[in-house]
Amino acid sequence: MLKFYYSAAPNPMKVALFLEESGLPYEPVPVDTRKGDQHRPEYTAINPNAKVPAIVDGDVTVFDSGAILLYLGEKTGQFMPAKTDKARGELLSWMMFISSGVGPYSGQAVHFRNYAPEKIEYAINRYVYEAHRHYGIVEARLAKQKYMVGDTYTIVDMALWGWARNVPIVLGEGAWEKYPNVKRLIDEINARPAVARANALKDKHKFKTEFDDEAKKAMFRHMHEKVA
């Protein structure tokens, strides 16, 4: 059975959503990142980058949420766009846009606003600006069509959902007013029964919630290892 290594963070939840939507049997394996589970040798043997999510499917190992969604979509044939070169090009382009842009800029905006030991105006402005810019591109896309790729719900929408459902946390209260079409899609996805099942995974394991010194050391090693 496929093993799914996860935490309650946005990127693992994208994969949890696919697994629950698809009905693919899987074994959830919690990785408590605030306790440092991601740095244990048995986990870095699966993902040398010490991040979640990852999956092990027989003799196949895949890490990074975007790669996992592509793998699972191709494996099952579910939640994929039409089998045309045009649709394939759009799928890959928007998956990479989300993986390399929406996700990282959202994460860094949250980090510098909420977790950095000092408020650095330049860093906050840069990452919040870039997060806004990326969501603006998505908004323009969704103003013209119902879903990110084609006229059906695909893994691209799941990939977007992971971070986009947290827009008020990323960009601040009132941010939804700027992105009504993004909100429309996220509200539609949130209403799907699979979302409730995916979210329930977080309650199956009592993940550490305290952001104490142990958590900081486990999640943000640069705070304790000066290299520049």
Predicted regions and their residues:
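Acidic/histidine-enriched, glycine/proline-rich intrinsically disordered or flexible terminal extensions
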Residues: 202-228
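GST-like fold's C-terminal all-alpha helical module
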Residues: 86, 94, 98-193, 228
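Phosphate-coordinating loops and pocket residues in cytosolic domains that bind phosphorylated ligands
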Residues: 45, 191, 200
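Short, solvent-exposed turn/loop segments enriched in Gly/Ser/Thr/Pro and often Arg
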Residues: 32, 155, 202-204
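Active-site-flanking alpha-helical
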Residues: 73, 163-164, 199
